[in-house]
Amino acid sequence: VIVVGAAYAAMMILFVLATRTTTAANAIFLQSTAPLYLILLGPLLLREPIRREDILLIAVLALGISLFFISSEKPAATAPNPFLGNILAVTSGIGWALTIAGLRWIGRGKSGAEGSLATVAAGNALAFLIALPMAFPVERVDWRSLSVVVYLGVFQIGLAYVCLTHGLRKVPAFEASTILLLETALNPCWAWAVHGERPGGLALAGGVIIVGATIVNTWWRTQRAGADS
């Protein structure tokens, strides 16, 4: 529980730092490369073998990732250091893969959903303790700021991960990661609508490759599972 909670905390903190230093699209797209790391970690952590089609997916996802680093995005108000932010986002994706694999492993055990919820709670508590010094000094507190914090804590984090921990008991780790791509697809749209943030062309191409490859792979797995049954 502690180890998976630490991976969860690292993923959360790294993703927040990534969104502060690169574009929202880059951060969410690169974090969504978690399926790549799940494929590599599957045989070790979950005893899920690597299939031939997984090797092709690894190559396509690696191509998508490379486009983010080839893209020469200039620093902006919402993305002061795109290169560093991209690295943080990739690392966050590794933490996300470890979290999904760990929650899946815990969900298979005797503790079930209770163990998964305890892990998420421990991860949030650890993330809070690590990030607490960054909150000081407190310059201004208003109702708008408090309402955003409450919304993020209750809905964006709390309710979302309650649903996630229950769902991971019934959905394979790889498919769970790809189902969550809806957030990935909508995130750049919200960032553009609210902040006017526009990622570079190569970054968008990399994001399309990553999302498209995982969707196709999930569809292929679903079709094959149906044929086998």
Residue spans for each PLM region:
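Structural signature of hydrophobic alpha-helical transmembrane segments
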Residues: 17-34, 82-94, 143-157, 208
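Helix-helix packing/entry segments at the starts of transmembrane helices
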Residues: 27-33, 103-126, 157-193
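Transmembrane alpha-helical segments that form core, pore/gating elements
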Residues: 38-40, 75-138, 149, 229
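Specific transmembrane alpha-helical segments of multi-pass solute transporters/efflux pumps
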Residues: 1-26, 30-31, 66-67, 153-171
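Hydrophobic/small/kink-forming positions within alpha-helical transmembrane segments
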Residues: 5, 9, 13, 35-40, ...
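Hydrophobic transmembrane alpha-helices of multi-pass small-molecule transport proteins
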Residues: 8, 40, 50-72, 124-126, ...
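Hydrophobic/aromatic residues within transmembrane alpha-helices
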Residues: 18, 23, 44-46, 50, ...
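Membrane-interface helix-cap regions at the ends of transmembrane helices
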Residues: 13, 62-79, 125-147, 192-193, ...
